[in-house]
UniProtKB/Swiss-Prot annotation:
Subcellular location: Cytoplasm; Cytoplasm, Cytosol; Membrane
Name of the protein: Glycylpeptide N-tetradecanoyltransferase 1
Gene from which this protein is expressed: NMT1
Organism: Bos taurus (Bovine)
Complexes and interactors: May be associated with other proteins.
Pfam families reported for this sequence: NMT, NMT_C
């Protein structure tokens, strides 16, 4: 990272954003506004499977450390405030406040209940402890929307990224690859490929101004990004035009410069200009106020490698050989008529998906064009397989997307190839059989692990197919400027990349 970003002039105290402070999909790491230092929150999909107590010791040590920090900060409090400039006093008070509420973002509702959310208390979202029984916007749509962009810290400038330019796409890939979501132990980091980013960021209706970048003025280096994509969302009995907020990322060396809140305010302004006032996003941290909470589960496909890179561990009384045998899969799928999705299947996949999602409370409402974009197979991005019966009718389909993770500091293995369950629809084939075949197909394609959230009907097959619950954070689902009762994971029917 060039000197420009390190030496950029300190920004003025950030104004409280008026905006859709969501960030999506962990993607969707919004609590930067409360604690800028921890910009990359774990969405849950990276965390090792929970089959050992090996981390308990670490947690104890961490707690001790935090206790020490709190004590130290308390001792530091009697500074001669009146001998310092007002700006410096504010900084010290802010630091003391951070220590007093505990280090880092809240991972559980219990932790969150002890935090104060000064930023989120100004936003159109329900309060954490609020019991919501109504449905509708928190505040009405705005008529007069700010026309000029928000002010960035000195030395930085806005740039709407043209992802059709391979050089720009590569810059975004590099920013995310080096600074985006890591697991809590800094062992794995999402590795979104340039092609995957085009798939995730350019669905039907995408707008270039919603690919919102921040550059260093002098070097033109890309140091920040946030995105929005359009989506029709069905929430309980209402269908609403929203955006999905995603890929909030700030370069590690800029985490103290309060860039993230400005990014979120700016994407909100740009979305408001298009007449959209609601958003959906996910995060691995607890903010006011989750509408649903899901958890990642992991199914070993290549147990030896997963153990070698410490993604999972040998259970007590288990040898490597017995573990390999436990997770062994058939050589080929067993469902008759299972084949890759073709162009001719788009209308029937659209129909099957639309019908299936009606049973859930939070779902996308996709057009046929969107179904083509999100489900038509692309190598190393999205795989969809349909089941065609003897009469030539497509009755079921399964899908998973590809999202590898970089393995940090391992002498042999550099990448972990992970498949993520997307949408799976069954009318004739039992879901258990369909997902068993999904595992076989993923194994055949060289994946190391198959990840799935416990949403929709997924709980019915997770344990039976030998998935293990992740030991990472929950994935929280949020709505911006929309109030509704919260729901169980089994009623969430929305998967964000």
């Amino acid at each position: 990272m060039g000197d420009e970003s390190e030496t950029a002039v300190k920004p003025p105290a950030p104004p409280l954003p008026q905006m859709m402070e969501g960030n999506g999909n962990g993607h969707e790491h919004c609590s930067d506004c409360e604690n800028e230092e921890d910009n990359s929150y774990n969405r849950g999909g990276l965390s090792p499977a929970n089959d050992t107590g090996a981390k308990k010791k670490k947690k104890k040590q961490k707690k001790k450390k935090e206790k020490g920090s709190e004590t130290d900060s308390a001792q530091d409090q009697p500074v001669k405030m009146n001998s310092l400039p007002a700006e410096r006093i504010q900084e010290i008070q802010k630091a003391i406040e951070l220590f007093s509420v505990g280090q880092g973002p809240a991972k559980t509702m219990e932790e969150a209940s002890k935090r104060s959310y000064q930023f989120w208390d100004t936003q159109p979202v329900p309060k954490l402890g609020e019991v919501v029984n109504t449905h509708g916007p928190v505040e009405p749509d705005k008529d007069n929307i700010r026309q000029e962009p928000y002010t960035l810290p000195q030395g930085f400038t806005w740039d709407a990224l043209d992802l059709g330019d391979r050089g720009v796409l590569k810059e975004l890939y590099t920013l995310l690859n080096e600074n985006y979501v890591e697991d809590d132990d800094n062992m794995f980091r999402f590795d979104y490929s340039p092609e995957f980013l085009l798939w995730a960021l350019r669905p039907p209706g995408w707008l270039p101004q919603w690919h919102c970048g921040v550059r260093v003025v002098s070097s033109r280096k890309l140091v920040g990004f946030i995105s929005a994509i359009p989506a029709n969302i069905h929430i309980y009995d209402t269908e609403k035009k929203m955006v999905e907020i995603n890929f909030l990322c700030v370069h590690k060396k800029l985490r103290s410069k309060r860039v993230a809140p400005v990014l979120i305010r700016e994407i909100t302004r740009r979305v408001h200009l298009e007449g959209i006032f609601q958003a959906v996003y996910t995060a691995g941290v607890v903010l006011p106020k989750p509408v649903g909470t899901c958890r990642y589960w992991h199914r070993s496909l290549n147990p030896r490698k997963l153990i070698e890179v410490k993604f999972s561990h040998l259970s007590r009384n288990m040898t490597m050989q017995r573990t390999m045998k436990l997770y062994r899969l058939p050589e080929t799928p067993k469902t008759a008529g299972l084949r890759p999705m073709e162009k001719k299947d788009i209308p029937v996949v659209h129909q099957l998906l639309s019908r299936y999602l009606k049973q859930f409370h939070l779902t996308p409402v996709m057009s046929q064009e969107e179904v083509e974009h999100w489900f038509y197979p692309q190598e190393n991005i999205i795989d969809t397989f349909v089941v065609e019966n003897a009469n030539g009718e497509v009755t079921d389909f399964l899908s998973f997307y590809t999202l590898p993770s970089t393995i940090m500091n391992h002498p042999t293995h550099k990448s972990l190839k992970a498949a993520y369950s997307f949408y799976n629809v069954h009318t004739q084939t039992p879901l258990l059989d369909l997902m068993s075949d999904a595992l076989v197909l993923a194994k055949m394609k060289g994946f190391d692990v198959f990840n799935a959230l416990d949403l929709m009907e997924n709980k019915t097959f997770l344990e039976k197919l030998k998935f293990g619950i992740g030991d990472g954070n929950n994935l929280q689902y949020y709505l911006y400027n929309w109030k509704c009762p919260s729901m169980g994971a089994e009623k969430v029917g929305l998967v964000l990349q």
